[in-house]
A protein has these predicted regions:
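Hydrophobic, helix-rich cores of sensory/ligand-binding and other regulatory modules
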Residues: 2-183
């Protein structure tokens, strides 16, 4: 192994830590169905409207899966690059449904934060299986928390911007579709 550091999302990371992050990401990808089920349950617990019917629940679950797989796959590559900057289409699908149904956008924030918390808790459990307590585990958790939280912040920003655009289009269409009253 060469003695240099990777730049992951602007963070200098030693190769040994990049490898450990990849090992934990691999474990989580191997258990992705369980992770997504936990994320889904946590989101519905805090925002029951996201499980109100099969259609929105399926979209929410697809979004959770797409975001988790995207981030974990990027970490598992062990190449020092973060997750892609674009938002998974599944994440945009569910936010459009939220807007079209007139659901408060705060649900999106709650859902992402709850999903992030579940993923982070699972990551810590797997990390403790891969690395003994000590400085290496601390470095692994510090790097991963920065990468994970930055990814979620970035996705939330883009998803909310898309939601606001969608809402403006819907409101504009409704406003233009209403006949004007004469004075």
């Amino acid at each position: 192994m060469r003695w240099h550091t990777y730049k992951m999302a602007g963070i200098s990371v030693p190769p040994a830590v990049v490898e450990l992050v990849g090992e934990v990401a691999d474990l989580m990808l191997n258990d992705i169905d369980h992770l997504v089920a936990e994320m889904d349950a946590a989101v519905v617990e805090i925002a029951p409207v996201m499980g109100a019917d099969a259609a929105i629940a399926a979209e929410m679950s697809a979004s959770n899966r797409a975001n988790a797989v995207r981030l974990l796959t990027a970490l598992a590559r062990r190449d020092g690059r973060g997750a892609p900057a674009d938002v998974p289409p599944e994440a945009l699908d569910v936010v459009r449904t939220v807007v079209r149904r007139g659901i408060d956008l705060d649900v999106i924030f709650q859902a992402y934060r709850r999903g992030q918390n579940v993923a982070w808790q699972r990551f810590m459990v797997y990390a403790a299986q891969v690395v003994a307590p000590g400085p290496e585990l601390v470095a692994l958790l510090e790097v991963t928390s920065q990468l994970m939280f930055s990814y979620v912040d970035q996705v939330i920003g883009r998803v909310i911007a898309d939601a606001q655009h969608e809402r403006e289009e819907l409101l504009g269409a409704r406003w233009h579709g209403v006949p004007r009253r004469s004075a």
